[in-house]
Amino acid sequence: MMEDLKSIIRDIPDFPKKGIVFKDITTLLQDAQSYQRMIDLIAHRYVGQRVDKVVGVEARGFIIGAALAYKLCAGVVLVRKPGKLPSETFSKTYSLEYGTDTLEIHRDAIKPGERVLIADDLLATGGTMAAVVDMVLSMRAEIVDCCFMTELNFLNGRSKLPAGKVYSLLNF
């Protein structure tokens, strides 16, 4: 079943720059049965656990996070680029391969003690998710897991995340 889903994701060579093979998930998302199966398989892992909020990371994490929140009867929290959220925010600046980036979350989005599932489409180097984990922990929430649709194993991004709190449906 996983191989069926993996086969739907197309490789785009030299995107966004030469030497990179981009995993294009849009082919899976636009196929209704495959998208539903992907969400169901990830959600199944958390059925029976208390999940209060699902955090979706801009932008493709919204696609997965909102669907998981619906399946798990949880609220949705958005993590966005600076200036995109209308109320007071916490922000986190983190290092990229070349430079830095910043993410924001509403200050009142997560209450202390809430159990939070963080969702994104892809785990690559782990830098973005590590920043989100720091923000969620600073809000005194408990992380259920960091879950991903896909993971690029050779980049070892999970080493930057809490041990035992990483789940990827499809590994490349």
UniProtKB/Swiss-Prot annotation:
Q: Which reaction does it catalyse?
A: AMP + diphosphate = 5-phospho-alpha-D-ribose 1-diphosphate + adenine
Give the highest taxon in the source lineage: Bacteria
Which cellular component terms (GO) are annotated to the entry? cytoplasm
Top class in the EC scheme: transferase
Q: State which pathway it belongs to.
A: Purine metabolism; AMP biosynthesis via salvage pathway; AMP from adenine: step 1/1
Q: Which UniProt keywords apply?
A: Cytoplasm, Glycosyltransferase, Purine salvage, Transferase
- Record's function text: Catalyzes a salvage reaction resulting in the formation of AMP, that is energically less costly than de novo synthesis.
PANTHER family in alphabetical order: ADENINE PHOSPHORIBOSYLTRANSFERASE
NCBIfam families in UniProt = apt, PRK02304.1-3, PRK02304.1-5
As for family, the record states: Belongs to the purine/pyrimidine phosphoribosyltransferase family.
Tell me what this protein is called: Adenine phosphoribosyltransferase
Q: Which organism is it from?
A: Pelobacter propionicus (strain DSM 2379 / NBRC 103807 / OttBd1)
Traced from the root, the source organism's taxonomic lineage reads: Bacteria, Pseudomonadati, Thermodesulfobacteriota, Desulfuromonadia, Desulfuromonadales
